[in-house]
């Protein structure tokens, strides 16, 4: 199993930095592989990628490879960052939405996590139910005659 994490930080302005981490949770190392992702937040022609080779982009499709043919051992994580984004992401699904790895003539599925803000803790969800207060006695019958 492969797992991809996404994070975003607002620097450098105006669109910030997109960071990706691919973790090999499988039982075999990845050798001579590429990572493909689809994302609504695209990398523009004027960009900087650190820790990976940016092979190509076609619309929302992006393909990356490790530097110098590095392999990804079992339990290891490959991290890289990209600057020069089309826009800042606004939602947790604005980074990699789908991903797959091509290795050894096979296409391997990748589980993708939601985008997180790298510079801030995640916001707590709102309460699911309002705080309740009983002002009348509780009735177990569906339609009691009186309370």
Task: Label every model-predicted segment.
Residues 1-10, 54, 98-101:
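Generic structural motif
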Residues 2-31:
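Short beta-strand elements of extracellular/lumenal beta-sandwich folds
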Residues 8, 66-71:
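Beta-strand-rich interaction surfaces with strong enrichment in secreted/lumenal proteins
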Residues 16-22, 56-68:
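Generic recognition of long tandem-repeat/solenoid scaffolds
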Residues 19-21, 34-36, 63, 79-81:
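Ordered hydrophobic segments in well-structured contexts
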Residues 23-57:
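Short acidic, flexible loop segments centered on an aromatic residue
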Residues 53, 60, 70, 74-143:
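Terminal connector regions
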Residues 147:
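N-terminal carbohydrate-binding/catalytic regions of secreted carbohydrate-active enzymes
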């Amino acid at each position: 199993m492969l797992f991809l994490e996404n994070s975003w930080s607002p620097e450098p302005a105006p669109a910030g930095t997109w960071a990706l981490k691919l973790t090999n949770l499988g039982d075999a190392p990845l050798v001579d592989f590429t990572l493909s992702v689809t994302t609504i937040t695209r990398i523009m022609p004027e960009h900087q990628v650190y820790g990976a080779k940016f092979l190509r982009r076609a619309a929302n499709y992006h393909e990356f490879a490790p530097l110098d043919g590095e392999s990804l051992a079992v339990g290891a994580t490959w991290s890289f960052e990209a600057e020069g984004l089309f826009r800042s992401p606004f939602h947790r699904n604005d980074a990699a939405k789908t991903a797959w790895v091509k290795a050894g003539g096979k296409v391997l599925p990748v589980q993708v996590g939601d985008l997180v803000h790298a510079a801030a803790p995640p916001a707590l969800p709102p309460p699911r139910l309002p705080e309740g207060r009983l002002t009348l006695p509780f009735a177990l019958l569906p339609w009691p005659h009186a309370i």
